[in-house]
A protein has these predicted regions:
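N-terminal, polar/charged subdomain of small-to-medium soluble alpha/beta proteins
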Residues: 1-102
C-alpha cells in the first residue's frame, strides 16, 4: 500500500509519522484490497489536525482528529477510521447473509 504524507504549515516529528504509517497499514489490512493511504498533518496556531484517508476497492474512508498536539489528534483520527471500518465490515456481512429467494 502506498502512503503519502502531506504537511501543511507543520513540522511533524519522525516518530509521529512512523506511528501514523504503522497504524494506517494495520487498519488497511482490515479493508479489502487497500490501494493507497494519505496522511495529512496541519498546524494552525495552537491547534493540530491529522486527517487520514484510506482508499481501497471502491471505498474511500476519511477520518479527522484535532488536538493541541499531534499525538492526541492522531489517536482521535485513528479511532474515527476504526469506527468507519467496523461499519463497513457490518455492511459487508449483512450483504453476504441475504437469503436467496427462489
Amino acid at each position: 500500500m502506498d502512503i503519502v504524507y502531506q504537511s501543511h504549515h507543520a513540522t511533524v516529528p519522525e516518530r509521529v509519522r512512523l506511528n501514523a504509517s504503522r497504524a494506517l497499514e494495520r487498519l488497511g489490512l482490515r479493508l479489502t484490497r487497500p490501494v493507497s493511504g494519505v496522511i495529512r498533518f496541519e498546524e494552525d496556531g495552537r491547534m493540530r489536525r491529522v486527517e487520514l484517508e484510506l482508499v481501497g476497492r471502491g471505498r474511500r474512508l476519511v477520518a479527522e482528529g484535532t488536538g493541541r498536539y499531534f499525538g492526541p489528534a492522531l489517536a482521535a483520527a485513528l479511532a474515527h477510521l476504526e469506527a468507519q471500518l467496523r461499519r463497513v465490515g457490518r455492511l459487508n456481512v449483512r450483504r453476504a447473509r441475504r437469503p436467496v429467494r427462489a
